[in-house]
Amino acid sequence: MPQHLTAEHYLDTALEALATGDVCPSVLDKLPVPIYTTDEAGAVTYWNRACVDFAGREPTLGEDHWCVTWQIYTTSGDRLPHHKCPMAQAIREERSIRGSVAIAMRPDGTRRAFTPYPTPLFDDDGKLIGAVNMLVDVSAEQAQVLADQAKRCRRLADATYDRQTCGVLSNMAEQFAATAEQLAL
């Protein structure tokens, strides 16, 4: 089954469990993907064991905000503050956020690429009460994309006669290759 269909299935299972009140530890703890919830202010209120395995740390309920990961980076390597992550955006805009990829850095320095599925939760009156997020590990796919980018940059560097352009492309190739290697660990 394609990964996005599996992800959507797990998310639907989590949303159904939350809607029926059958939350901890029964349904969500059994899911093999990281799932966590926050209140309307972004404070983490629940996480399953897969979150710890993915993030390399145990989130602190009520203290961690927006995400269960230690640090987040964009795919271009820029630090993404937690208050600007897709989960924060979903709560702020009161809508589901789809289609992004981010890099989680664990406390031990290892990195995992992931696709988040932040989805706001509303009470029966339509008032925002929090959000649920599922993190799908896409490290292998992202490592391959970055390795391919490194190869392209090297080919372009080899084909150009401008020393400065060659240097920039070679540097980009090294950065792409290094990040791909980190994700492949």
Predicted stretch roles:
Residues 48-51:
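N-terminal capping loop/helix in small sensory signaling domains highlighted by a polar->aromatic N-x2-3-F motif
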Residues 121-123:
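Sensor-regulatory modules in signal-transduction proteins
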Residues 59-108:
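Terminal output helix/cap of sensory domains in signal transduction proteins
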Residues 116-118, 129-135:
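Sensory-domain boundary capping and coupling elements
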Residues 41-43, 53:
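PAS/PAS-like sensory domains across diverse signaling proteins
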Residues 1-33, 92-95, 132-145:
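PAS-family sensory modules
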Residues 35, 44-45:
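Conserved hydrophobic beta-strand signature of PAS-family and PAS-like sensory domains
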